[in-house]
């Protein structure tokens, strides 16, 4: 059953990526990238993780509002492309791993610079 769940999650991720690029014209979601999908065991809910190219708080709120507005359209189009008995309800959550990774990169770059300054 886990293997099927993984396949379905991957298919939902691919289809949602296509949908947001081709069918959703809202400029608030133009910088949104879907990173992962986690489905409930009965496939009634799908948590969709997304990231943004910016760390601007206002842009994040606008993107969240744009995704919430487009949720119904995305679910409808997802239902047309998937062969499932029931299309899962979409729940959007911000993926914090991208922000965390960039902070780690900055810290490592700072440490490297400090090390080079000590050697000189």
Swiss-Prot record:
It comes from Lactobacillus delbrueckii subsp. bulgaricus (strain ATCC 11842 / DSM 20081 / BCRC 10696 / JCM 1002 / NBRC 13953 / NCIMB 11778 / NCTC 12712 / WDCM 00102 / Lb 14). This is Ribosome-binding factor A. GO terms for molecular function: ribosomal small subunit binding. The keyword Cytoplasm applies. Gene3D superfamilies: 3.30.300.20. It is found in: Cytoplasm. Keywords: Cytoplasm, Ribosome biogenesis. GO terms for cellular component: cytosol. It holds the Pfam family RBFA. The gene is rbfA. One of its GO terms (biological process) is maturation of SSU-rRNA. NCBIfam families: PRK13818.1 (NF010391), rbfA (TIGR00082). Belongs to the RbfA family. One of several proteins that assist in the late maturation steps of the functional core of the 30S ribosomal subunit. Associates with free 30S ribosomal subunits (but not with 30S subunits that are part of 70S ribosomes or polysomes). Required for efficient processing of 16S rRNA. May interact with the 5'-terminal helix region of 16S rRNA. Its main location: cytoplasm. Monomer. Binds 30S ribosomal subunits, but not 50S ribosomal subunits or 70S ribosomes. It comes from the Bacteria.
């Amino acid at each position: 059953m886990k293997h099927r769940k993984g396949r379905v999650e991957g298919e939902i991720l691919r289809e949602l990526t296509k949908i947001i690029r081709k069918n959703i014209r809202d400029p608030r979601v133009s910088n949104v990238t879907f990173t992962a999908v986690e489905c409930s065991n009965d496939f009634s809910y799908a948590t969709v993780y997304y990231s943004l190219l910016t760390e601007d708080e206002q842009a994040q709120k606008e993107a969240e509002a744009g995704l919430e507005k487009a949720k119904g359209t995305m679910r409808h189009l997802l239902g047309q492309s998937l062969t499932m008995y029931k299309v899962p309800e979409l729940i959007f959550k911000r993926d914090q791993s991208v922000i965390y990774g960039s902070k780690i990169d900055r810290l490592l770059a700072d440490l490297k610079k400090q090390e080079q300054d000590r050697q000189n």
